[in-house]
Each structure stands twice: as C-alpha cells, then as structure tokens.
Amino acid sequence: MTGQGLAHLDRRRVLALIAATASTFRAASAQGSRQVLRVSAPYNPSTLDPHTGGAGSDHVVLYPMFDTLVGFDPETLQPKPGLLTAWKYADPLSLVLDIRPGITFHDGEALDAEAVRFNLERVRADARSVIKTELATVAAVEATGPLQVTLRLKQPDSALPLILADRAGMMVSPKAIKQFGPDSDRNPVGTGPMKFVSWAANESVKLTRFENYWQKGQTQLDAIEFTIITDVVTGVRSVVSGQNNFIYQLRPTQQQALSRSKEMHVGVAQSLYSVVMYFNYGRPPLDDVRVRMAINHAIDREAFNKAIMMGLGAPAHTVLPASHWACNKDVATYYKYDVERAKALLAEAGHKDGIDLEFSGYSDQRSVQTQEVVIAMLRKANIRAKFTTGALAVVTTEYFTNKKGDGTLAAWTGRPDPSVSFALMFNKESFLNAGKVEISPELTQAVLDSRKYTELDKRKAALDRAQILVAENALYLPLVFQPEIFGHAPQVKGYKSNLLGKPRFDGVSISS
C-alpha cells in the first residue's frame, strides 16, 4: 500500500472513532474530582533509571519524577536554574555548581553536595551508565561545600550546563541506588513533582503527587498515569472516549482529522525529533562508506516527508533542523535523491547486482508503515532491505547492545546542547555507536572544539565542521524532522510544548 493510501485509511479510522465515541467521552470526562492526567503513551520505557536507559522516548515518563540540575527554556532551550540556583566557571577548567537548599528526594533523603557528587560520578563511571560520554571532559567531581560541587575539567567545556539539563542532570536518590542496586531501574526515586507508584511492563506507569515538592504550586495534578498503547489510532480512541485525556506523537493524518473535532484539542509544534536509521559501520557491508552513501542517495526525502508526515515535517540532512542556530545548511547538498548514483556506488563497492541488508525496527503500526516506505525506496536502487521488528526495548537491546543487524530505523530525539547530539550518536564509546568504531577522529575533535567556546559564532564553526564530517562519512541516514503533534481533552489546561518535542507536564491542570 502506498503512503498516500495509508494516510487515507488512517484518516477514515480516526473520523469513524470520533463519531462512535463522542457521547462516551462526555460522560467519562465528567467523572471524578481528582486531577489525574491520563496519558496514552506510544512506547514502554526502556528503564526508569535516567542514567541507564537508551531510549529518547523515556524522557516523557522520567521528567515528572526527576528534576534536573539545570532547567531549560521550552522555546529556546537556553539554560535556567533548576536544582541549582547558579553555576559559574571559576576558571576555564572549573565549573562551580550551587545547589538549591531545602530539597529532598521522594524517600526523604536530602539533596546535598554529596548526593550530587554521587550522581555525577555514577554518570561518569558506573558500568551501567549509557551516558558516560556526556561527562567525558570531567576529570573529577568534588564536594566543595555542603551545597556546592565543583567539576574539574580536562579541557574547557561550555556545553556542560545544558548537559546537566538532560539525563546527566537528573538526580537519583543515592540511598535508593544502594538499596536496589541493578533493580533501581524499576524503583525510581527522584526529586520531581511526581513519585513512583508502579510499572507494569507494556501496560502502564503510575505516578502520584509528591507532597513535599520544593516548587510549591508548580503542579496541580494529583497523579499521572501512562497507559502504553502502541497503536496510535487506539490511543486516539482512548482519549476521545475519556479513558485517557492526553496523547502525544500523533500522526499528521490524525492531526488533520482531529482538528475538526470538538472533543479534543490538537496542537502542532516544530521539534528536534528526527526519524533516522543508525548504521553499524563496525562490520561489513556498512563498514564501506560507499554502501552508506548509496543508502543516503537512494532516499527521496521530500517524497518521504509527504508520505509519512503529509508534508508537515521537514526533510532531514543533518542532526539539526534548518532553523537551528548551529545547522550547517550546506550539508543539504551532499545526498540529493539519485538512484543511479546509488547503484554506481554499490557497484564500486563490489555489489553490482545489488545488496541484501538486515535492519530492525519497532513493531507498532506507524513504524511498520515507515519501514515499508524505506524498503520501497531502497529497492529502486537494488538495495534489498529486510526488517525484523519488535518492541522498542527489545529492538534497542538487540541492536545497540547485542549488535544484531546492519542498522536500525529509529529516531534521534535531540538534546538541549547541539554538541551532545554528535557525541552521543557518533563517539566511539557511545551507546548509539553499535560498532564501537571511530570512523573520523577529526569529528571527535570538532565536537570537543565546539565546547571550548561560549561565543556562538566560534561554536558554530566547529559544529559546521562536525556536520560536514558526518555527511562525508555517511555515518547515518537522516530522513525527516517530525513535528510534535499532541492532543488532549478540553479539560486539560496549561500544556506547553517544547523544542525537544518531548512532553513535559509542568503547570498542567485539569478543570472540572
């Protein structure tokens, strides 16, 4: 079935369910006085430990439980105070962090300098940490006061404040880590407005209000309950019927259909989220740059955007969208759609009769449809792709940990600081570099160079170089930037999207 045919089918299903469930929605939405945000979530978390999880989709569940040391502005991603009241570079190799007083973890333990030091050392050195590269420039973490920590650096690193606005800055109770050990991923204890109740894998994650939260009045919600619904049409039905009252990662077809419904508010916002294919270039045949280049030339990104995003997205040529201050727009010229060029590159690489490749991907309907479009485009260039599908957590483990397959069709969800994207995707020791190969030492250096400066023009020059090196080496297949499309019941108030495209529920309330 073509992308256009899939779109029409999807739209018809959505319109039908609106008509069928509208009356049920009105009855269900009037029930209960507790403010419970019930979220239809498309993916089961890979883990509830922010330092050991490998899926960008985990953030939506992690944010309510784990505050970060540094916050960020939702529109600009510029850093702002969080668990830290302030931070400053005492000198180019010393970053001083001042911790907000009076904060406790959900288990009653105090957030102090020792707790922060413990967490940052865990990120840097724990065997289970998948984000070690984020703090690669840190030589030592020292508690230099009861509420002060100083990071001693190997070299200047201007990206650290925004690195601490992501997973590396999510603080976990040291007591809980010591108590639960490897089971801490199922027993999360943070400092956020919501504390953990239960996680039934592939079914639900339930959180309840943390009464001793340090930001009084920040949330009016009594609870957040995530129901794992991988089929997005079923997820829409759950919101229209009143079973849930919030859904994210809607398809563009559903946005068009639901925009005419009075039963749900639908919003669209641009984001850093991109659909990508990761390559294992540590093994044949993708260790040959010509094969990787051929795959890139075989994809018609404009047609892909129309088929999968109905034109609401933007063709992706690099990690950053064209509107981002650090985007190198020249990279868009590297891989124009050219089937004959793709075939020629394969022939040069010794595959004149084409090539068979084994990829993996998720098993939900949306992902399978995306895989079908990729298969059809690659076939025209004599690239015969076969996908093995499964749940997100399974696919993530099989490809990135167990090294199975030539590549995986997934996503890159972006990070507040652009340099982190390049480090996490392509660094030799990164979790996302399945082959654990350093194709380009110059790329590694360019990323490090981008962190030496605070001036944006100097940072951009280094990041421009990084993007060129990624393109020249065809280190992955960027496909399309996906807009954040969300929907919620009219009673849900105060939701604001962010540029990362990962929903946060700060300030959300539910009217009666």
Predicted feature descriptions by range:
Residues 384-396, 401, 421-490, 512:
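Extracytoplasmic/peripheral linker and loop segments enriched in polar/acidic and small residues
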Residues 40-91, 121, 187-190:
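N-terminal lobe/hinge region of extracytoplasmic solute-binding protein
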Residues 211-257, 375, 384:
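Ligand-site clamp/hinge motif
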Residues 112-119, 146-152, 192-193, 220-223, ...:
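Alpha-helical secondary-structure segments
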Residues 314-348, 366-369:
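Structural transition elements
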Residues 88, 132-176, 198:
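Surface-exposed binding/hinge segments that line
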Residues 73-74, 78, 165-219, 223, ...:
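Gly/Pro-rich hinge or "lid" segments in bacterial periplasmic/extracellular proteins
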Residues 201, 252, 325, 343, ...:
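Ligand/substrate-recognition segments at binding pockets and active sites
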